[in-house]
């Protein structure tokens, strides 16, 4: 049993340290912006409700991609597998040409960019935008779900500033 060492004021650094110890699944979120497709890597995606299907995520308002993304009416949340580490890194790199030759994607009939080979892609309609601090929390209703052909791929997770593959060896029970 770990004995608490005491309470500390919730500084920004201590808060970030706490969440570095908390693993999170990785997603790439894409939308059609006014100047073309936009996208970013996110570790904040979570399910909110199964009926109706709703998810939520947060993005930094300082990001130009996030600014265009949160103004869209619809978007696609791609839940990534470990074999898509390169895509996660590409969409996390500021100033990268995310929709150039490195990413295999195509526009859906509704206009949003869909990344090929994502294990899961959830097309969503934004329901709510909530500004909090330097971030925007988005709640979105899932309109359709596309399951990729590689549904048995290990998920990509982020923990302590590094990407990891979650596999059978990590199963505890």
What are the residue ranges of the model-derived segments?
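Basic, polyanion-binding surface patches
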Residues: 1-173
